[in-house]
Amino acid sequence: MALWILQNSSMYDYLVVGAGLYGAVFANQAKAQGKSVLVIDKRPNIAGNVFTEKIEGINVHKYGAHIFHTNNKKVWNFVNRFAEFNRFTNSPVANYKGELFSLPFNMYTFNKMWGVVTPSEAQAKIEEQKKQAGITEPKNLEEQAISLVGTDIYEKLIKGYTMKQWGRPCDKLPSFIIKRLPVRLTFDNNYFNALYQGIPVGGYTKMVENMLEGIDVKLGVDYFDNKSEYDAMASKVVYTGAIDAYFDYKLGTLEYRSVRFENEILDIPNFQGNAAVNYTDSE
């Protein structure tokens, strides 16, 4: 097996705390440079938040779906050394109380929402609603969203979903959060505007395992339980965990927003007809 558990302790060039993508890539590249590396992780598995597990023949992304995408050919060639990638293209669907809309926001979305058929008609509708809302300089997420896509789309496809996601009203969130959201005046529902995208065939866990081949890995241990002992095992430490924990919460705890995953196995061939469906009402 490529991945094995450390049996004895010795001096390493690097201690890598965290066996996720960053830790695995760093360890792989350090080993390629002739460095000795020990990777530790408090979880019982490698791959961090991209950990995948096969259930009923399906590669389940245990911490939420992850689609690899990049414009960098060097990066794409690198990850393809460790896994074959499929041709998955992320084209989400928004479900608002049974109404289905195309994501990211594009001409399919605008056509369904307003019946417009040309980019100029869509842009005019957005400008009309932006003017009606009296927004000139967006001060929060709500105003920024209306400036980008108008009031109707904000109310149906952004407001409730964002409140569920962040646990706060949209007018209490900063505007920059939504600025990266793709908005297109074309009939293009490919979420990522990247040259290369896909998901590793066999799952991310196998890809990370291949990256860590021949590298000492110790799982199920908390770095902070024996920090001084682990620090003494290597010349340098590469820490990939929570930054507030690393500094022992001396400046307080960072305000993380997380989700709860509920898994259910259904005896049907296809549940929702699309890999990603956003349920955008507030419930």
Ranges and model annotations:
Residues 33, 222-283:
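Mid-domain catalytic core of redox enzymes
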Residues 97-101, 108-236, 240, 245-247:
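Active-site/ligand-binding neighborhood in enzyme catalytic cores
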